[in-house]
Amino acid sequence: VRSSAASDVYKRQVKELREMTGAGMMDCKKALTETNGDMDAAVDVLKKSGAAKMEKKQSRIAAEGIARVAVNGNVAVVAEVNSETDFVAKNETFQEFVQTVADTALASDLNGGANGEDIEALLATNGLSDLLVEKTATIGEKLSVRRFAKVTGDAVASYIHGGGRIGVVIAADGASDDAAKEALCL
């Protein structure tokens, strides 16, 4: 039996762990109980649990999703990340993750494509793979980085259509940014 003061500390720990990890309340309680209240160890338990949950979801089909773009000067990236349902694709947490994927791809030396090697290399960049595991556990659906493409030119422009269902980047050499935007009819 816990004292009232101990119970309050425990509740605060559960709340803090939830805020840190985005994991569910019961998962946080279980992790804290398993680690006797050690927050760092509880985070590790949740990471392992998230990886196990992700492994179980790998056979599911993730056919919904969105595209996001990232632009820096004369380089642009469009990235597509899929989820199982359109409900999740509209989720702010998921959309922020997709933007993180696009930003990470932009900062990387990878050119993209749908081939597995570039996707695997991208996931190995800046802890993106760990973030994918975390978001899969938090959101509760299979998430997959489907593809990304990077373009470079004298001028680049980007466009997202249909709430993120279609993303376009265009690069032009010997042209201005205005000419690239005109080519996209912006």
What are these regions (language model features)?
Residues 1-6, 10:
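Single conserved hydrophobic/aromatic residue that forms the stacking wall/gate
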Residues 11-186:
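N-terminal assembly/interaction segments in proteins that build large macromolecular machines
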